[in-house]
A protein has these predicted regions:
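Catalytic cores of nucleotide-sugar-dependent glycosyltransferases that transfer UDP/GDP/TDP-activated
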Residues: 1-266
Length: 266
């Protein structure tokens, strides 16, 4: 496929958060595709442990201000941006005082999931897509990284399926070894629907476990990347059942080219 415009939706990017596999890919894959003459946009959450002053984040007033209703509560969408000068690359941040003020990412200081991670996940996915619409920038390919971006494929394929910004976009979802214990909020399935989405479309997460959330992302994606060696067999079995194109994350030396070729094959 033509891949002139690629939207990257990730949950971690260095240098804003500590380095791990997902934050490393989130940083260098967009740069690699930009160096191959693709136009890119990159998004991540503005978690409260990101140092705004050191990283020179600033609000983009023209993109901020929308209210998103989740579980009958209004949540203002704030958009911030920062530049990675060495890569000539901008990163957009989805922010909101209710969801991203705390000085942690997805778990508290005891390692427990935040009870509102379900609503944070919804806000992030919808916030990214609404911002891309405001930018009037139609991606050819959307590459999502990590479970916090897992609702993006659903919203693109169901809620925004007739929107000219998204109606031709292919979706790639990258899965990493980042399973969480327990479940998200039991009412998650009731909070997700907007527009044409019904609870039938998201039946997979009646029990909102990590594996079921990843399976929902696979259900609405066009292709998958297995970003770690250790992915639960239940997820692998579901991926094989759906018969989607997939690749294992290639080695460090040539992964940009491997992703480039994979994008071309879709």
């Amino acid at each position: 496929m033509e891949k002139d415009k690629i939207l990257f939706v990730t949950q971690e990017i260095i240098p804003y958060l500590p380095e791990n596999k997902i934050s490393h890919i989130g940083r260098y894959l967009p740069q690699g595709m930009q160096e191959r003459d693709c136009e890119i946009r990159t998004f991540m959450p503005r978690f409260g442990n990101i140092n705004e002053r050191r990283n020179q984040l600033h609000e983009v007033i023209r993109l901020s201000g929308m209210n998103m209703v989740i579980n009958n509560t209004d949540h203002p969408l704030i958009i911030k941006v920062a530049s990675i000068q060495s890569a000539r690359m901008q990163v957009y941040f989805i922010d909101n005082d209710d969801f991203f003020k705390r000085k942690f990412t997805l778990t508290d200081d005891k390692g427990h999931l935040f009870p509102d991670n379900d609503e944070r996940c919804i806000f992030y996915a919808r916030g990214v897509l609404e911002t891309v619409k405001k930018l009037r920038w139609a991606p050819d390919l959307i590459h999502c990284h990590g479970w916090f971006s897992a609702l993006v494929p659903l919203y693109v394929k169901k809620a925004f399926k007739e929107d000219p910004i998204f109606d031709h976009a292919k979706i790639v979802f990258s899965i990493y070894d980042q399973a969480f214990e327990g479940t998200l909020n039991k009412d998650f399935i009731k909070k997700i629907p907007i527009d044409d989405i019904t609870t039938k479309d998201i039946k997979l997460i009646e029990n909102p476990t990590y594996n079921n959330l990843i399976k929902l992302a696979i259900q609405y994606s066009d292709a998958v990347v297995l970003g770690d060696e250790h992915i639960h067999s239940e997820i692998i079995d579901y991926l094989n059942q759906k018969q989607l194109p997939f690749i294992y994350h290639p080695n460090e030396e040539n992964y940009i080219e491997a992703y480039n070729n994979f994008y071309d094959s879709l």
